[in-house]
Amino acid sequence: ACYCSLTARILKFDVRLHTKFGSDFPLVDYLIEQKIVFENALSTKQTTQFTLNLVNSERELFLQNKCDPISNITLDADSVIISPLFDEISVELFEKIKNDASFVLLDPQGFLRRVNSENKIYLEQTDLNLSNVSAIKVNQDELKCLTGESNVDGIKILQKKGIDSIILTDKQNISLLSENRIYSITLPNLELNDTTGIGDIFCAAFGCTMLKEKD
């Protein structure tokens, strides 16, 4: 949520952040300084955190803390990025948010994540209602969980569900399906030590550009 919010502020958008964090969260003052508005964010539990193991830019996540869920959201904006981490947004709240906004950009990772007996995070195939979603950002594993397919076949399934723009990320390869055309770019061959936050930054930049340029 912080990565999305800060990126949107850099792009000169007003931001209202709906999230939960505990008393251990160190960036409250910084968010206020950046004029990011948030209310009822303080949780009785510690901030959701993961232990991250990196192997050649591949991530293994282990759940360390789980914050309180978000109980309710009243939107006062036409556009929203929905980007849960782990189990903080219920299906009912997800439906409400979608119906209250005209432009919805979804990063579904938090709806797909599960935890095993060792607290290791894994993804599970999930029947998520994607109606009223304008754009979605997924990686190959998330695409497989949502559609049962990968690559172009999976993207087309999402398109048939009514999503206008589908962004597929695969390490340095990024593809966008929009209006029956697929656009692809390959990022420079850089050594990646930690990719945390890249997806959030990309989502926010894409969403803000769509709102500003309508394209």
Give residue ranges: language-model regions.
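Short catalytic helix/loop segments, enriched in acidic residues and glycine
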Residues: 1-9
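Short beta-strand scaffold segments in enzyme catalytic cores
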Residues: 6, 50-52, 174-177
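Conserved phosphate/ATP/ADP-binding segment of small-molecule kinases
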Residues: 112-184
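Conserved N-terminal subdomain of the carbohydrate kinase-like
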Residues: 9-105
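Phosphate-handling active-site elements
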Residues: 14-16, 182, 209-215
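Short, charged, surface-exposed secondary-structure boundary motifs
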Residues: 48-51, 113-118, 192-200
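Short, conserved phosphate/pyrophosphate- and ester-handling motifs at nucleotide-, phospho-/glycolipid
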Residues: 8, 139, 199
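Short, small-residue alpha-helix embedded
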Residues: 192-215
